[in-house]
């Protein structure tokens, strides 16, 4: 490990002999350098590929100077509302303001604005007019096309339009962000980066976009709720990276938002690399006086072993973010991570969680998915389990036993 947090000040940049950062990551969460926090993962992945990244965590959106603390980045700003949609973070289902924010120092509420992604982009644009702005994270990912907003009881446009960002990275963005960085670094204008899977862009020339499936227009969605249902169904049928089509949603004044097909899932080797990077596994020391960041407590001694879920539950948005194809880490990678944190002075012998969206999904649903992806019009588990479904928990049980056998480990959950 480097034993270094990512730069959060000019002093940090000077210590690393960085005159100008390649990227500045603006996030609605406090800076926690842990693989359960998206800003840490994306930033460390970029760092692994040779790019310098600084973090502006929870800037004061009422002060334009708060966005200039690290200077103008060479390639662009990365913006995320945080690990959770900022509105879900702020309000209960009854639309009452929550009293605490686990992703803020000391659990204090009010460190980020409502609709944080949009507000942060506007903050950047007031100071840096031409710098590329790329948005991502759960808030941007699930609002990438027209969507019903529960909080305002209205149909909102794509967050790409409302934020004024140049590009949106949806889903788990490790591969997309590296391709974006390489494109920008090669000298391509952000407006010309329209070819990367897992991204959404806007255009005034939809007729020039090839092989595109047109969704019902935004205007038609506001006129007929059945059009909204049709649009959602088309989107749902195109969440697979192997068969998903390019989608376009038209808006007034000749503007269209184009969603490229999803990125291919990471291989096990790639997953191992992502989770084996130089995370400090705790909050930045600048939060010590506040008592730290509460959100780390639930994941400090937990392990992310897999991604994706083929459950297909109606109430769950996971298909739209991580997809239905299971991606797993190797036993060696998980054991190495566990060996690191069991030496922590706060470790009491309990590994709190080993899993992901669904802990016992340690392999793809069937062999076909390796080459062809998921079935477009069939579910793995509904209305009854598919006969091709591989039901085998032996690998998961073996992993749990291996973790349990480590010194100082009492129980694994």
What do these predicted regions represent?
Residues 166, 274, 309, 334:
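Conserved, mostly hydrophobic/aromatic
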Residues 322-347, 402:
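Conserved alpha-helical substructure of the radical SAM core
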């Amino acid at each position: 490990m480097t034993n270094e947090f990512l730069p959060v000040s000019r002093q940090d940049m000077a210590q690393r002999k960085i005159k100008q950062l390649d990227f500045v990551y603006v996030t609605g969460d406090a800076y926690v350098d842990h693989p359960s926090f998206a800003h840490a993962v994306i930033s460390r992945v970029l760092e692994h590929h040779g790019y310098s990244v600084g973090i502006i965590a929870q800037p004061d959106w009422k002060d334009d100077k708060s966005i200039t603390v690290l200077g103008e980045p060479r390639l662009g700003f990365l913006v995320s509302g945080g690990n959770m949609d900022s509105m879900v973070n702020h309000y209960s289902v009854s639309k009452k303001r929550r009293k605490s924010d686990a992703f803020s120092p000391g659990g204090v509420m009010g460190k980020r604005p409502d609709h944080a992604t949009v507000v942060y982009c506007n903050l950047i644009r007031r100071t840096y007019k031409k710098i590329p702005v790329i948005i991502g994270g759960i808030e941007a990912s699930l609002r990438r096309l027209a969507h019903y907003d529960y909080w305002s009881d209205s149909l909102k446009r794509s967050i790409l339009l409302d934020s004024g960002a140049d590009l949106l990275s949806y889903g788990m963005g490790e591969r997309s962000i590296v391709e974006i960085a390489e494109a920008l670094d090669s000298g391509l204008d952000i407006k010309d980066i329209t070819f990367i899977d897992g991204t959404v862009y806007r255009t005034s020339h939809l007729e020039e976009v090839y092989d595109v499936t047109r969704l019902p227009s935004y205007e038609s969605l506001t006129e007929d709720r059945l059009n909204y249902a049709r649009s959602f169904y088309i989107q749902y049928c195109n969440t697979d990276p192997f068969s998903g089509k390019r989608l376009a949603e038209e808006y007034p004044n000749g503007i269209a938002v184009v969603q490229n097909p999803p990125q291919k899932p990471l291989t096990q080797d790639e997953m191992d690399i992502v989770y084996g990077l130089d995370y400090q596994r705790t909050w930045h020391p600048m939060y010590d006086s506040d008592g730290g960041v509460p959100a780390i407590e639930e994941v400090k001694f937990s392990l992310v072993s897999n991604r994706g879920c083929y459950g297909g539950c109606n109430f769950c948005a996971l298909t739209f973010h991580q997809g239905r194809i299971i991606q797993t880490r190797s036993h060696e990678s998980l054991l190495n991570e566990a060996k690191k944190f069991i030496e922590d002075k706060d470790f009491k012998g309990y590994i709190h969680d080993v899993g992901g969206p669904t802990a016992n999904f340690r392999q793809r649903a069937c062999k076909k998915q390796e080459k062809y992806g998921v079935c477009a019009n069939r579910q793995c588990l509904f209305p009854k389990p598919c006969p091709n479904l591989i039901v085998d928990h032996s690998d998961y049980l073996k992993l749990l036993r291996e973790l349990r056998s480590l010194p100082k480990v009492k129980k694994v959950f």
